[in-house]
């Protein structure tokens, strides 16, 4: 499994916009907040591995 690193750019209701920090891209990934750890906010750094997000 690949490990991908993100930062939460913004939160819009029940969704969060994530930006990869380990790759050079300007695209955002829209993810339902129900799939993310509790207590996230803009600026939170996340690790995605084995289909789970973890705050780092």
Regions found by a protein language model. Name each.
Residues 26-38:
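Beta-strand/loop nucleic-acid-binding surfaces
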Residues 3-5, 28-30, 45:
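Well-ordered beta-strand positions in beta-sheet-rich domains
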Residues 1-13:
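Structural detector for short beta-strands of small beta-barrel domains
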Residues 35-48:
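Short nucleic-acid-contacting surface segments enriched for D/E, G, S/T with interspersed K/R
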Residues 50-56:
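Short, Lys/Arg- and Gly-enriched loop/turn segments at beta-strand edges
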Residues 14-18:
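Short aromatic-glycine-enriched beta-strand elements
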